């Protein structure tokens, strides 16, 4: 267990929320309507169209996180399973990149101020 917590300490810390501009504005509830929004916390990933609750987080050898989640899409019933990869941005080490299971980048997020 110690190795996992050390990897997490050196890797990605989600104890504070990360988001794009609108994700951070809306982190405490819907403040502004936005077509594009990304908010990442230690428990969920929220976009303009869906909300995903994390079931499991696995730290990878490269320091990235692979997250399995249940997602609820706007206007749809029930939850769908999903997998995301969260890793540090190659351009800016303070930012994180969120990609879906297919490797499509959903967006880049920075720690909310």
What are these regions (language model features)?
Residues 3, 17-18, 46, 65, ...:
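Processing junctions and N-termini across compartments
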Residues 47-91:
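Contiguous, well-ordered beta-strand patches that form the walls/edges
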Residues 21-22, 70-73, 99-104:
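Short, flexible beta-strand-to-coil junctions
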Residues 12-14, 19-47, 78-79:
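Short, solvent-exposed loop/hinge segments that bridge or flank secondary-structure elements
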Residues 85-109:
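Short, exposed beta-strand-loop hairpins at the edges of beta-sheets
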Residues 15-17, 43, 62-68, 92-97:
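Short, hydrophobic/aromatic-rich segments at coil-to-beta transitions
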Residues 23-27, 51-53, 70-72, 111-113:
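Sequence contexts marking disulfide-bonded cysteines in secreted/extracellular proteins
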Residues 3-11:
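Sec/Tat signal peptide C-region and signal peptidase I cleavage site
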């Amino acid at each position: 267990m110690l190795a996992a917590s050390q990897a997490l300490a050196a890797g990605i810390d989600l104890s504070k929320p990360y988001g794009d501009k609108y994700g951070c504005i809306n982190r405490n509830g819907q403040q502004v309507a936005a077509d594009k929004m990304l908010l990442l916390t230690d428990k969920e990933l929220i976009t303009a169209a869906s909300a995903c609750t994390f079931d499991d987080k696995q730290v990878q050898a490269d320091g990235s996180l692979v997250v399995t989640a249940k997602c609820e899409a706007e206007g749809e019933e029930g939850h769908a399973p999903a997998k995301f990869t969260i890793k540090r941005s190659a351009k800016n080490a303070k930012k994180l990149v969120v990609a879906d299971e297919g490797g499509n980048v959903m967006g880049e997020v920075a720690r909310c101020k």
